[in-house]
């Protein structure tokens, strides 16, 4: 009887250690994935856009992209980039 209880307790201890190892590995993988996402995001931000996106706020110092035009749209109190009915050339 003592041997069976000892075996069960030992098995539970082994499962606890393995579970802790898997959680640590999963957490490290999650952190690595998050770091990769932030790295990709930072890389895309470094590619400076010289124009504003669709429905983005525009001014003289913030022009719209080639296929967009800056228009005043009521009731919005600022100018936004809207489609100029043209397509960008590649």
UniProtKB/Swiss-Prot annotation:
<keyword id="KW-0872">Ion channel impairing toxin</keyword>
<keyword id="KW-0800">Toxin</keyword>
<feature type="disulfide bond">
    <location>
        <begin position="58"/>
        <end position="70"/>
    </location>
</feature>
<keyword id="KW-0960">Knottin</keyword>
<keyword id="KW-1015">Disulfide bond</keyword>
<dbReference type="GO" id="GO:0090729">
    <property type="term" value="F:toxin activity"/>
</dbReference>
<feature type="signal peptide">
    <location>
        <begin position="1"/>
        <end position="19"/>
    </location>
</feature>
<feature type="disulfide bond">
    <location>
        <begin position="51"/>
        <end position="65"/>
    </location>
</feature>
<dbReference type="GO" id="GO:0005576">
    <property type="term" value="C:extracellular region"/>
</dbReference>
<comment type="similarity">
    <text>Belongs to the neurotoxin 10 (Hwtx-1) family. 13 (Hntx-13) subfamily.</text>
</comment>
<dbReference type="Pfam" id="PF07740">
    <property type="entry name" value="Toxin_12"/>
</dbReference>
<feature type="disulfide bond">
    <location>
        <begin position="64"/>
        <end position="81"/>
    </location>
</feature>
<protein>
    <recommendedName>
        <fullName>U7-theraphotoxin-Hhn1c</fullName>
    </recommendedName>
</protein>
<dbReference type="GO" id="GO:0008200">
    <property type="term" value="F:ion channel inhibitor activity"/>
</dbReference>
<keyword id="KW-0732">Signal</keyword>
<feature type="propeptide">
    <location>
        <begin position="20"/>
        <end position="50"/>
    </location>
</feature>
<comment type="function">
    <text>Ion channel inhibitor.</text>
</comment>
<dbReference type="InterPro" id="IPR011696">
    <property type="entry name" value="Huwentoxin-1"/>
</dbReference>
<keyword id="KW-0964">Secreted</keyword>
């Amino acid at each position: 009887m003592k041997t069976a209880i000892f075996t069960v307790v030992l098995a539970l201890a082994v499962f606890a250690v393995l579970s802790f190892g898997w959680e640590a590995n999963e957490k490290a993988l999650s952190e690595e994935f998050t770091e990769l996402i932030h790295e990709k995001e930072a890389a895309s931000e470094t590619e400076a856009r010289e124009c504003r996106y669709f429905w983005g706020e525009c001014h003289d110092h913030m022009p719209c992209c080639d296929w967009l035009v800056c228009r005043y749209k009521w009731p919005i109190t600022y100018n936004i980039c809207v489609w100029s009915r043209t397509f960008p050339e590649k």
